[in-house]
Structure formats: C-alpha cells, structure tokens
Design a protein with these regions (language model features):
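Conserved functional micro-motifs across diverse proteins
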Residues: 1-78, 82-186
Length: 186
C-alpha cells in the first residue's frame, strides 16, 4: 500500500510545483507590463518604440465647436502634435492624458474621427490635434502619454510621457483633421 502512495504524492507535488512556477512567470510578465516611463519635453522630436512624436502644446476651453457649441462641466483639452513611425503604417494606440495624481483621461466619444488618432506612416509626418475632456482643476498639471504598438502585450515595454504646457482659452476649440507635413517639418 505504501509503494502506491509515493507515486501519487510525487505527482501531486510535481503538479503543485508546475502550477506555482507558471503563476510566478505569469505574475512577473503582467507586473512588468508598462513599467518603464521615458520622459520627454514639448518642442522636440521624441521616439518610443516605432512611434516618432513632436508635441507642440495644448489649449483648454470649456466649450467645443462641433457644428454647434458643446459645453463641458470640466474642460476640453486639444493637444497639438505631429507623429510618424520609423518602419511601417499603423494606427497607434490612443494616447492618454495623465494628471499629477496618475489618473488617466482618454479621448471622449461622439466626435467622429476629428480629434482622435490617425494613421502613422514611416517618416511621413502628419500634424493634428487630439481631444480630451478633463476636470478643470487638473488642467495645469497634465502630461500626454504615448504607448507604442505592442507586439507582445505581456512583455515589458516603454511609454513616453511628455508634460504639457496648456494655455487657457475662452473661445471654443475647433476640431480639424490631420494634415501631411512637408519633408523636415514637424
């Protein structure tokens, strides 16, 4: 009877060890996901992954001109930027605004493709605006965070965070579509 227990005990022990090992590997991959944050500044060419970015600035207003005025209980923020890729065409993951407390703000829905991300091409720079809606009290402490294309979502990656200089406007913000830039322009 004893000789039959040892193989069963050994198999249970092996199964527990394999399960614990798999959990440790999975937790390490997930825990290391977006940990590295590269910092950049407005006005310069920056690269993260295969995305090249140039942030020109941002403007905030409580009113958006979307064929008719749209008001916000907070503020609309329009980030002026240009970007391209280093290798191939793709649609970047939507950037987010991050406030001083680490809260993230994504683009609001309902405004069509104006004010949202656009296709990026290899060294083909487009300039446009990305629209966000944030509480008014965080406008002075915002950064924009870019997350490059991830081929392996579980592997560690780098994000680019650029602090924004946001000017305030009483005029409604106007959305437009991105335009292709001449060679060397940003």
């Amino acid at each position: 009877v004893r000789s039959r227990r040892w193989p069963v005990i050994a198999m249970i022990g092996l199964a527990l060890a394999i399960g614990a090992g798999a959990n440790a590997v999975e937790q390490n991959h997930l825990a290391s996901g977006w940990h590295t944050v590269a910092r950049g500044d407005e006005g310069g060419d920056l690269t993260v992954g295969n995305l090249q970015v140039h942030v020109h600035g941002a403007v905030a207003s409580p009113v958006l001109d979307d064929d008719e005025p749209v008001t916000s209980p907070g503020s609309f923020v329009l980030v002026d930027l240009s970007y391209a890729t280093t290798d191939s065409w793709f649609l970047p993951e939507s950037p987010v605004l991050v406030d001083g407390d680490g809260r993230e703000y994504t683009e609001p829905s309902g405004f069509g493709s104006a004010g949202g991300v656009w296709m990026a091409g290899p060294d083909i720079w487009y300039r446009g605006g990305l629209l966000f809606e944030v509480p008014t009290d965080v406008v002075d402490d915002l950064s924009i965070e870019f997350r490059p294309e991830r081929t392996q979502a579980l592997l560690p990656s780098t994000v680019l965070r650029v602090p924004l200089t946001v000017s305030l406007s009483a005029e409604p913000l106007v959305l437009g579509y991105p335009t292709v830039l001449a060679e060397g322009e940003r």
